[in-house]
Amino acid sequence: MQIILLEKVLNVGNLGDIVKVKDGYARNFLIPNKKARRATKEAIAEFEVRRAELEKVAAEKLSAAQAQGEKLSGMTVQIAQKAGVDGRLFGSVTNADIAAALGKQGFEVEKAQVRLPEGPLKMVGDHPVHVSLHTDVTVDVTVSVLGEHV
């Protein structure tokens, strides 16, 4: 399906690009999330009229993400979980737990923005985690998992 992108989409294209993607990806994700529209003549003409407005909104989102990224970069988040004597957790620390801990510290982060390169954290200690605030803004946060011995 031919679509016109209304914002930058990772691994697809930038604002204003007309790209061909799988029908399901367009119908189920891009179009409902207002990231794209079908590339009809009317939609392309309407986009060209609104291009400056959309570019301004995209620049505002990027600058807001960069500002939040500067505050968040290099930060350490502490999460306490029950653990055995060998340092292994009963359960694990997931991206939802990390997003909730960041929320308590005043940062609005969705769980989908937290990237765990090796999956959920299952050991006590410090772990590097990537937080993707925008397609162009990714910061590293250290998650310190503290063990509560049972």
UniProtKB/Swiss-Prot annotation:
Record-stated family: Belongs to the bacterial ribosomal protein bL9 family.
SUPFAM superfamilies: L9 N-domain-like (SSF55658), Ribosomal protein L9 C-domain (SSF55653)
Function: Binds to the 23S rRNA.
UniProt GO BP: translation
Any GO molecular function: rRNA binding
HAMAP family with a match to the protein in the record: Ribosomal_bL9
Lineage: Bacteria, Pseudomonadati, Pseudomonadota, Betaproteobacteria, Burkholderiales
Coiled-coil region list: none
PROSITE patterns per the UniProt record, alphabetical: RIBOSOMAL_L9 (PS00651)
Name under which the protein is recorded: Large ribosomal subunit protein bL9
A GO cellular component annotation in the UniProt record: ribonucleoprotein complex
Organism: Paraburkholderia phymatum (strain DSM 17167 / CIP 108236 / LMG 21445 / STM815) (Burkholderia phymatum)
Keywords (A to Z) from UniProt: Ribonucleoprotein, Ribosomal protein, RNA-binding, rRNA-binding
Pfam families: Ribosomal_L9_C, Ribosomal_L9_N
